[in-house]
Amino acid sequence: MELSEWIDRHAGLEPGKTAIRFPERDLSYAQLAGLVERLASALKASGVAHRSCVAYLGYNSPEMLATLFACARLGALFMPLNWRLAGPEHRQLLADCPPSVLFVEPRFVAQIDAFRDALADVTLVAFDAPPQGWISYEALLERSGDAVPRDPQVGPQTPLLICYTSGTTGKPKGALLSQGALAWNAVNSIDLHELSADDRILTTLPLFHVGGLNNQTTPALSAGATVVLHPKFDADATFDAIEQERITLTVLVPAQLEMMIARPRWQSADLSSLRMITTGSTIVPERLIREVHRRGVPLVQIYGSTETCPIAAYVKPADAQRKAGSAGRAAPHCSLRIVGDDGHDVKPGATGEILVRGPNVMNAYWNDLQASAAVLKDGWFRTGDMGHQDGEGYLWVDGRKKEMIISGGENIYPAEIENLLGESPDIAEVAVVGRLDERWGEVVVAVVVPLEGRTLDAGHVLQLLEGRIARYKLPKEVVFLDELPRTALGKVRKDDVRQLVARKTFMEQT
């Protein structure tokens, strides 16, 4: 089967049920199925064929999801673009994977129109008055004709989604995910969340990342649930939706949770409809987990990446407090290994690189054989994350392999120090990086963002660690910032932090 059959099936079973609830308008499953059908026909009339690419630049919207399912019907590739990127970055991605059709929401039209000459073979679609050389969304839909028959060549093995990695270092890579990867990911999500047609999902994460698209949104539509979709995250709008829409499930990354907890409204908000909140994308501070549990809502962690669609492991709600801080066990249709530098499995409790295998893992990186070969070996995806498993098989993520600090020959994992400092009620954010040092090779630097209204000094920060970790792990320097640089999904850009620390050191020495 191909993924648009999910929508058709529920349109047949409950045509009037709300599939997507968006500000000021709802789409029933029948209406969503009709839009997908019309859009697929219009795209086909515009030259989109099997393996063609369709790109979309805009905030979360029903049209964005409909485009994904229309591409699934045609066997085409859907490429959602990160609206936080600058024009030259979008130009780079569109050159890496040239689309046949590019949908652009109003706020971003000028940005794309600035390099329109480089998109001569692309049908450019605007949602309001189109510039010269563009067409309107309505004009595109008018190209639709007869229903598009299902193509027997389109199935689970057919590539569907190109999601570019966050690009925390170097050139972003496009992870190529098949229709089967999204389908198996939905099965994993349904198991974790016990998803059913009765659920009401709130999506605030951007759909241009697998975290927003596939943690709950596409799984919810596969289950016939209702997705309450926000264009982008706003803390107060999130509170409103949870209370007024009686939301049962949502995904919030730690940075979003921090913003909500900082609001006075957090203490009294009605969260009684929530069965759980799912989080991930970065290591989750234990104080954050405790605070959400204090409000009576299980906070469950997912482990995964763009390349795993993303769900590879998770903690079930029953274990959320007992295993606070763990990324859980392997999802039902995934396997995990922890391997040492020799490629052999390490013993429980020992740290090694996390490997993932399963039908939800990407096919390859688009247009990058070398990078694909480096991470896909013998059927396993090498995540680049370091972690260990306890005696019960629960995964604990220790940090990125490339972020490990080697000081005086000793291996130091930043996540250990970050977790300890993150417990402090005076610290909002922390990132630990290495700085080059003539004597030790590298030394530890803690970059700290104090909680608003709090005053900290280096001595206070170091005191939080004294006696809790080996002395060689203690930061040799503490840097204070107002905020940390982050990706769209809330991951700290460690390369930017390292560069900032290096510049500071250089300025002090000159």
From Swiss-Prot:
Regulation: Inhibited by high concentrations of substrates, and by the synthetic auxin compound 2,4-dichlorophenoxyacetate (2,4-D), which does not serve as substrate.
Superkingdom of the organism of origin: Bacteria
Record InterPro entries: AMP-bd_C, AMP-bd_C_sf, AMP-binding_CS, AMP-dep_synth/lig_dom, ANL_N_sf
Reactions performed catalytically: (indol-3-yl)acetate + ATP + CoA = (indol-3-yl)acetyl-CoA + AMP + diphosphate; (indol-3-yl)acetate + ATP + H(+) = (indol-3-yl)acetyl-AMP + diphosphate; (indol-3-yl)acetyl-AMP + CoA = (indol-3-yl)acetyl-CoA + AMP + H(+)
GO aspect biological process, one term: fatty acid metabolic process
Entry keywords, A to Z: ATP-binding, Ligase, Nucleotide-binding
Any one GO molecular function term: medium-chain fatty acid-CoA ligase activity
Disulfide cross-links: none
EC number of the protein: 6.2.1.75
PROSITE patterns (alphabetical): AMP_BINDING
Subunit structure: Monomer.
Family as reported in the entry's similarity comment: Belongs to the ATP-dependent AMP-binding enzyme family.
Function as written in the Swiss-Prot or TrEMBL entry: Involved in degradation of indoleacetate, the most common member of the auxin class of plant hormones. Highly specific indoleacetate-CoA ligase which catalyzes the ATP-dependent activation of indoleacetate (IAA) to indoleacetyl-CoA. Also activates some closely related compounds such as the non-physiological compound (2-naphthyl)acetate and phenylacetate, which seems to be a fortuitous substrate for IaaB.
PANTHER family: ACYL-COA SYNTHETASE, MEDIUM-CHAIN ACYL-COA LIGASE ACSF2, MITOCHONDRIAL
Protein name as annotated: Indoleacetate--CoA ligase
Gene symbol of the encoding locus: iaaB
